[in-house]
C-alpha cells in the first residue's frame, strides 16, 4: 500500500515543524530514551503478504513512546521556567513519561489525575518520578483534572506540558521515525500508527514527508473515539459528544489544533481508518499468544488496523506498538470483547417454563456439540408460569451460529437474542 507525497506538513501556516527539528530532537533526547527494536513479524507478514515489522515502543523505558515528547519539551525550558515548576494532567502514559523526564532532569513537577485513576497507574507515576513528582487528584473526571492543572499554571506561573498539541512534544514523538529509517535498509512503503490526540502521527508524518520519497502513513483510531477523522471531515478540530473509553490511550474527544494542521497539510500521504474495540482486543490477544507482546489497547491499534487494511503484497510495512502499560485485571474484559468480535460469544434471554425438566430440554434440544454455556443467571418466581434467564453461549466456530438459532426457533421455549449495542448488552461488557 502506498501513496504519492503531497505537500509537506511543515507547509501549513499553523504547523512550523521540520525534519531537521526532529533530527535535533533525536540528539536531544538520546541520553534518556532507549532506541527500541524493529522486530520482524512472520505471522503478520504471512497474513498480509507484506514484510511487516513491529516498532516496539512497548519496550521503551516507561513502556510507551510518551517519554520522547515529554523529555524533548522539558529539556528545552529555561532555568527560570524549570524553577517555576512544570505541570501535566494525565492518568496514563503521558504522566509516566513526564514523571520520568522530571526525575532525569531533577525538576519538580505536578501531575493532576482524575479520582477514578487506578492505584496501579498512580503507583507507576510515583515510581517513575520519585521525589520529583507530586500526584494531585484534580476532580472526578479527566476534564476536571485538566482544568485543575490549568488553574495551577495560571496561579503559579508553572509550565504546562501537553500530551500532544505542542511542537516540542510532536518533535519528540517524531523521533520514532528517525529510528525506523535508521533501522531499515530501504524506506518503508507504509507506516501504521495509532491515533489519539495526534502527536505521534503528526511527528512521524512530518519526518517521513521530508526524508522519504514514497512512504505512506496509515493512522488507526478506535471506532468509538475517532476525533481526528471527525476533524479532517469537518475541516477543523471538533469535540465529540461521546467517547468510548476502552482504548484509553487513544480516547480523546478532540484532536489537537497543531496535530490536525499537520495531517490536513499532508494530503494524500496520510489516510485514516477506524477499528472497533473488539478487533483491538483480538489483536492484543494475538500479539500476546504469538509474539509474546503485552500490548495495551492503544498499543495494539496499529496491528488491528493493519489486518483490516488493503495491504499491497510485497510491500514493507512498519506497525507501531505504542505502549505496553496494560492492567492485567482487564484481560477478562479483553477476552470477552474479542470473543464477541469473532462471533464466538452470544447472549440470550431465555423464558423458561417454571416446570421440571425445562432446563434439560433446552440443553438437549438447543445446544450443539461444540456449544458451551458460559453464563447462566436465573431466579425462580413461584407466582409466574415462566422465568427469564440470562444465558451466555460460546460457540466452537462462528459458523455454528446459524444452527444454534435454527434450533432455538424450533423449540417451544421463547428465546430472545441480545443485540450488541443494546443497553442490556452494554451492561455485560
Swiss-Prot record:
Per the record, the similarity remark reads: Belongs to the serine/threonine dehydratase family.
For the modification N-acetylserine, which residues carry it? 2
Is Lyase found in the keyword set?
yes
Q: How does it assemble?
A: Homotetramer.
The UniProt keywords, alphabetically, are: Acetylation, Amino-acid biosynthesis, Branched-chain amino acid biosynthesis, Isoleucine biosynthesis, Lyase, Pyridoxal phosphate
**An annotated GO BP:** threonine metabolic process
Where the record annotates domain ACT-like, the positions are 346-420
What is the disulfide pattern of this chain? none
What GO annotations for molecular function exist for this entry?
A: pyridoxal phosphate binding; threonine deaminase activity
Xref: InterPro entries: IlvA, Ser/Thr_Dehydratase, Ser/Thr_deHydtase_PyrdxlP-BS, TD_ACT-like, TD_ACT-like_sf, TrpB-like_PALP, TrpB-like_PALP_sf
Q: Which cofactor does it need?
A: pyridoxal 5'-phosphate
Reaction(s) catalysed by this chain, per the record, are: L-threonine = 2-oxobutanoate + NH4(+)
User: In which pathway does this enzyme or protein participate?
Assistant: Amino-acid biosynthesis; L-isoleucine biosynthesis; 2-oxobutanoate from L-threonine: step 1/1
Q: What does this protein do?
A: Catalyzes the anaerobic formation of alpha-ketobutyrate and ammonia from threonine in a two-step reaction. The first step involved a dehydration of threonine and a production of enamine intermediates (aminocrotonate), which tautomerizes to its imine form (iminobutyrate). Both intermediates are unstable and short-lived. The second step is the nonenzymatic hydrolysis of the enamine/imine intermediates to form 2-ketobutyrate and free ammonia. In the low water environment of the cell, the second step is accelerated by RidA.
Q: Which residues bind pyridoxal 5'-phosphate?
A: 93, 196-200, 322
- Name of one Pfam family that matches: PALP
May I have one GO cellular component term? plasma membrane
What Enzyme Commission number(s) appear in the record? 4.3.1.19
By its UniProt entry, which Gene3D superfamilies does this protein fall under?
3.40.50.1100, Biosynthetic Threonine Deaminase, Domain 3
By what name is this protein known? L-threonine dehydratase biosynthetic IlvA
In the record, N6-(pyridoxal phosphate)lysine modifications are located at 66
Q: Which organism is it from?
A: Mycobacterium tuberculosis (strain ATCC 25618 / H37Rv)
Please tell me whether the keyword Acetylation is annotated for this protein: yes
Q: Which domain of life is it from?
A: Bacteria
Amino acid at each position: 500500500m502506498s501513496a504519492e507525497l503531497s505537500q509537506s506538513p511543515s507547509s501549513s501556516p499553523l504547523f512550523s515543524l521540520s525534519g531537521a527539528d526532529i533530527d535535533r530532537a533525536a540528539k536531544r533526547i538520546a541520553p534518556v530514551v532507549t532506541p527500541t527494536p524493529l522486530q520482524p513479524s512472520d505471522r503478520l507478514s504471512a497474513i498480509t503478504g507484506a514484510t511487516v515489522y513491529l516498532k516496539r515502543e512497548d519496550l521503551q523505558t516507561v513502556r510507551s513512546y510518551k517519554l520522547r515528547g515529554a523529555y524533548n519539551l522539558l529539556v528545552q525550558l529555561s532555568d527560570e521556567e524549570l524553577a517555576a515548576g512544570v505541570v501535566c494532567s494525565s492518568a496514563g502514559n503521558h504522566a509516566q513519561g513526564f514523571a520520568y523526564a522530571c526525575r532525569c532532569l531533577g525538576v519538580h513537577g505536578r501531575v493532576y489525575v482524575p479520582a477514578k485513576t487506578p492505584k496501579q497507574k498512580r503507583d507507576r507515576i510515583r515510581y517513575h518520578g520519585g521525589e520529583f513528582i507530586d500526584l494531585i487528584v484534580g476532580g472526578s473526571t479527566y476534564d476536571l483534572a485538566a482544568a485543575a492543572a490549568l488553574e495551577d499554571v495560571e496561579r503559579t506561573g508553572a509550565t504546562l506540558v501537553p500530551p500532544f498539541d505542542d511542537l516540542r512534544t510532536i518533535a519528540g514523538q517524531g523521533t520514532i521515525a528517525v529510528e525506523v529509517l535508521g533501522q531499515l535498509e530501504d524506506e518503508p512503503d507504509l507506516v501504521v500508527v495509532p491515533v489519539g490526540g495526534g502527536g505521534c502521527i503528526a511527528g512521524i508524518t512530518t519526518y517521513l514527508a521530508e526524508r522519504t520519497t514514497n512512504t505512506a502513513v496509515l493512522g488507526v483510531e478506535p471506532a468509538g473515539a475517532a476525533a481526528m477523522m471527525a476533524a479532517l471531515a469537518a475541516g477543523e478540530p471538533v469535540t465529540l459528544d461521546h467517547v468510548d473509553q476502552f482504548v484509553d490511550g487513544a480516547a480523546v474527544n478532540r484532536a489537537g489544533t497543531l496535530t490536525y494542521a499537520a495531517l490536513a497539510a499532508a494530503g494524500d500521504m496520510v489516510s485514516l481508518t477506524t477499528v472497533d474495540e473488539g478487533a483491538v482486543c483480538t489483536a492484543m490477544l494475538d500479539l500476546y499468544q504469538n509474539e509474546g507482546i503485552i500490548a495495551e489497547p492503544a498499543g495494539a491499534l496499529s496491528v488491528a488496523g493493519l489486518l483490516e487494511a488493503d495491504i499491497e503484497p510485497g510491500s514493507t510495512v512498519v506497525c507501531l506498538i505504542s505502549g505496553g502499560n496494560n492492567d492485567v485485571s482487564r484481560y477478562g474484559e479483553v477476552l470477552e470483547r474479542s470473543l464477541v468480535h469473532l462471533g464466538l460469544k452470544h447472549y440470550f434471554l431465555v423464558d423458561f417454563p417454571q416446570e421440571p425438566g425445562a432446563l434439560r430440554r433446552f440443553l438437549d434440544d438447543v445446544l450443539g456439540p461444540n456449544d458451551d454455556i458460559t453464563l447462566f443467571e436465573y431466579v425462580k418466581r413461584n407466582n409466574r408460569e415462566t422465568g427469564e434467564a440470562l444465558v451466555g453461549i460460546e460457540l466452537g466456530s462462528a459458523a455454528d451460529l446459524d444452527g444454534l438459532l435454527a434450533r432455538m426457533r424450533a423449540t417451544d421455549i421463547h428465546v430472545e437474542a441480545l443485540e450488541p449495542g443494546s443497553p442490556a448488552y452494554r451492561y455485560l461488557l
